[in-house]
Design a protein with these regions (language model features):
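Class I SAM-dependent methyltransferase Rossmann-like catalytic core
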Residues: 3-27, 31
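Conserved class I S-adenosyl-L-methionine
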Residues: 39-48
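Conserved Class I S-adenosyl-L-methionine
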Residues: 173-226
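Conserved SAM-binding strand-loop segment of SAM-dependent methyltransferases
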Residues: 87-99
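A short acidic, Gly/Pro-enriched loop at the edge of an enzyme's catalytic core
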Residues: 97-108
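Conserved SAM/SAH-binding beta-strand->alpha-helix loop
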Residues: 75-77
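Conserved SAM-binding loop of SAM-dependent methyltransferases across substrates and taxa
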Residues: 49-64
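Conserved beta-strand signature within the Rossmann-like core of class I S-adenosyl-L-methionine
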Residues: 128-138
Length: 226
């Protein structure tokens, strides 16, 4: 099955429900409100279990807007969790490269840690519409990486132009979180690409920890559809 399996999906939801990533969600909410009109049509591409999707919905409603929102993901397991949320958001199993929406039908597209399908995003966004592209910044999870690897290196940070889009701004989000249990540490580890490529000795060092303070660091790139 593509995407997260049932166990990983549940761990992800339990982790995010504790609001460790609340600073990122708050920044996404603020940008979503500032970049949309009164009746925005919003698509979260790679929405996962809907943590950011639901937060953005409530932010738009609280700002007096009437959003129409949808989310897509390739994982059936994680979308089942998203569909249990109470917000009136439509969810569908789909790829970012084959979005099940009409041409020029979206005002704001959210893309958190998912593949950037430039041509498909350009197709579905209205001219003047925006997409928010979230990527890990240089020191994201630095302290966790120090446990996992002998010689960790920072993530590459760059502002990339894309054909058909105007680069609007970058919003940097950074905080230090305190992971209170080994369960939380492992859940976060599962959410990262490091889970699949870390040597066994590094993973063993991480599994021996009961708590961990680590930096979370993100860049939100905002683009406008030309």
């Amino acid at each position: 099955m593509p995407g997260d399996d049932k166990g990983m999906a549940g761990a992800r939801r339990a982790f995010l429900a504790q609001d460790y990533y609340a600073p990122l969600r708050r920044a996404l909410c603020e940008l979503s409100v500032s970049l949309t009109g009164d009746h925005p049509r919003v698509l979260d591409s790679g929405c996962g279990e809907g943590y950011y999707t639901a937060g953005i919905y409530h932010a738009l409603v609280n700002a007096g807007k009437a959003p129409q929102m949808a989310g897509i993901d390739i994982s059936k397991s994680i979308l089942r969790l998203a569909a249990k949320r109470p917000e009136p958001i439509e969810y569908a199993v789909a790829s970012s490269y084959h979005l099940p929406v009409a041409d020029g039908s979206i005002d704001l597209l959210i893309n958190c840690f998912s593949p950037l399908a430039r041509e498909e995003f350009q197709r579905v966004l209205v001219p003047g519409g925006h997409f928010l592209y979230v990527v890990p910044s240089a020191r994201h999870l630095w302290e966790m990486k120090e446990v996992l690897y002998d010689h960790p290196y920072p993530n590459e940070v760059k502002e990339t132009p894309y054909e058909g889009f105007r680069y609007v701004t970058i919003r940097h989000v950074e905080a230090v979180i305190h992971l209170q249990t080994q369960q939380d540490i492992h859940a976060l580890f599962q959410m990262t690409p490091y889970y699949w490529k870390t040597p066994k000795d590094g993973a063993a060092r991480l599994s021996a920890l009961d708590t961990l303070d680590t930096t979370i660091s993100f860049d939100i790139h905002a683009y406008e559809r030309i």
